[in-house]
Amino acid sequence: MKIIAGSNNKLLATRLAITLNIKYIEPKITYFSDSEIKLEIQEPLHNEDIIIVQSTSKPVNDRLIELFLLIDTAKKAGANKIILVMPYFGYARQDKASNQAAMPAQLIANFLEKLGVTHLITIDLHSDKIEKLFNIPISNVKPINLYLPFLQNYKNCIIVAPDKGSTNKVETIGNLLNIDLAYITKERDINNSCNMVEITGNVEGKNCILIDDIIDSGETIYKAANFLKQHGALSVNAFITHAVLSKNYDIALLDRIFVTDTIETDDLSSKFHIIPILPILVKELKNII
């Protein structure tokens, strides 16, 4: 068995290889002047089981094409099973069918299967609907157990869902730690800007902990933090799985933000704390390989 790293998760792939005692391979990737990608794997792969590690985070489309080339090259080189570790599944927010727009998540699922992926491991999909798009085994690993040691240190706290999509995660954590819950109702206007309209639960004088899967522009988290402060919150912290961070984000109202390393990030504010996903990936891979 061998581990092949894409451009987006080299450090994670290296750590997986060391922990699992599997040979690490880094493909040769070059770019033409028009930004076309050329990819070569200069290692024999005949009859080998392969683990490919690649998130499709920014630049999303480049990394997606790179991933397709990685899988296709490995398959043509004679790889047997191909396990794809895709910590962050880009385009998962576009999972709804429409007559007016494509459904990229379905297309990606189709491509991955046709190219030869035999098992997909991903972390905290934005929508659980994505799992139903695949005909191959898929492991949607939740990071909640990684959060628990940190959450247990908070006193006088309440777990808050910033929108409907976070409800299940919040309730799971609340049940595990026997902590009170609060729910924010979020609406979007015609410009797709979000507005917090209602809160269920008493946050006054409490240390609030927001739980979400993605921080991108930071609008939801910022407005949720502001809404909580308006309702008397003592402090606001956040646990967020994927640090997409594609725009200038405002985190002034938050005390601390915990994110995982599904996406390799640089130059983060001192308010950020990175939680490694290595333990849960190693556990899942050991169940498969």
What are these regions, as identified by a protein language model?
Residues 1-289:
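PRPP-associated nucleotide enzymes
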